[in-house]
Amino acid sequence: MSAVKKRKIANKAPQYESDAESSSSHESVASKHSDNAEAQDGPESSETKPAPKSFKDLGIIDQLCEACATMGYKAPTPIQAESIPLALQDRDLIGLAETGSGKTAAFALPILQALMDKPQSFFGLVLAPTRELAFQISQSFEALGSTINVRCAVIVGGMDMVSQSIALGKKPHIIVATPGRLLDHLENTKGFSLRTLKYLVMDEADRLLDMDFGPLLDKILKILPRERRTFLFSATMSSKVESLQRASLSNPLRVSVSSNKYQTVSTLLQSYRFIPHKHKDIYLVYLLNEFVGQSAIIFTRTVHETQRISFLLRALGFGAIPLHGQLSQSSRLGALGKFRSRSRDILVATDVAARGLDIPSVDVVLNFDLPTDSKTYVHRVGRTARAGKSGVAISFVTQYDVEIWLRIEGALGKKLDEYDLEKDEVMVLAERVGEAQRQAIMEMKNFDEKKGTRAKKFGKGKRSRDEMDQEEG
């Protein structure tokens, strides 16, 4: 992957401009920062970690170590180094780590090693909050277990239940599922039982509970055998997650690789740019030209804006694809596949893409719309600068976003610099972007009409189990 393009960061206070371009002075973000030039880096984790070990040092057998090498895993990540030796001790485990920390291999490797020792069908079950994450976890299991011909089945909503029943009838070693569809099969698929299950993993447990899967998890836990090993992985330890671990784990060991709730990695270059709201599109196009040839995720707040920006960028010749919860399952998987393969290098997304998705090679994150909370900001920018690589995150701050931005900086524990660019260079693009905006408006009308037709056809009502494993954004 090419190195992220280096940019100079402005030390001067940003000049605010109103939508009306008036000459009256405005209070700047930098003036509220007070001593921006002397701002210190955010708090570091108080824990000191030893030098990374090899997977063999952790107790992983040679066959699986070779699979790790094939996948490009040079050394264990902190969560892997802490979790794997404990998981191999046949103990329940709670792992607290942020997105992009390598949690999947932290539970997949011990399960595969145990499977090699005592092969059987329905050996492990992994519960995930979203369909995309379920498919990615399955792919990781299959890649790491390729030398032992591990069989995985993905059981998620939005897919044909009959074909899933056939897949379960082939007795896979590992099932990766969303809770709603798994419970459907446990209740309705003849001959399907998990009474011999040995391992249960609840990945992104905080997200599972945020998406109201709690009652479904309770039902599933009552069906599963008590004599099993359970791994719970989460980015945070909320009261809901605490309750879940008490109900599902037996005398667990706990691993945490970060003591700072809002910590970001040191290889991530974060900045903001104050932008008049009406000029956001122009600045976005300018920055994409600055980072041409590099992969980028553009985060927006709504489905409508995600689609509009995708249409806008396509009209300008960019390879942009949307990702949000109102797309069909096949469209969402297709979008992720194109972005991973780099046939498209720009992903325009709601927060459906902020957590859990396996997109390892993102160079730039652009917060077109600021998130309303600091935790979501950290999850978004965590899509870049992963596994020791460098990355860039730039946030657009309009005259309406100043208070939100100051709250985010407060949570980070540091003041960020303004991204340096020349306004005159940006505004050269105004006419061209304006034409693309008009074209995008026409395409949005067609999109909204089709969406309205579907809404009338299917009606509105309480979410089904199938819909629950689809992100809201």
UniProtKB/Swiss-Prot annotation:
Residues 1-10, 453-463 have a biased composition (Basic residues). Residues 84-255 form the Helicase ATP-binding domain. Keywords: ATP-binding, Helicase, Hydrolase, Nucleotide-binding, Nucleus, Ribosome biogenesis, RNA-binding, rRNA processing. ATP binds at A97, E98, T99, G100, S101, G102, K103, T104. InterPro entries: DDX47/Rrp3_DEADc (IPR044765), DEAD/DEAH_box_helicase_dom (IPR011545), DEAD_box_RNA_helicase (IPR050079), Helicase_ATP-bd (IPR014001), Helicase_C-like (IPR001650), P-loop_NTPase (IPR027417), RNA-helicase_DEAD-box_CS (IPR000629), RNA_helicase_DEAD_Q_motif (IPR014014). Its main location: nucleus. GO terms for molecular function: ATP binding; ATP hydrolysis activity; RNA binding; RNA helicase activity. GO terms for cellular component: cytosol; nucleus. Residues 283-427 form the Helicase C-terminal domain. The keyword Cytoplasm does not apply. CDD domains: DEADc_DDX47, SF2_C_DEAD. A motif (DEAD box) lies at residues 203-206. Interacts with the SSU processome. Belongs to the DEAD box helicase family. DDX47/RRP3 subfamily. This is ATP-dependent rRNA helicase rrp3.
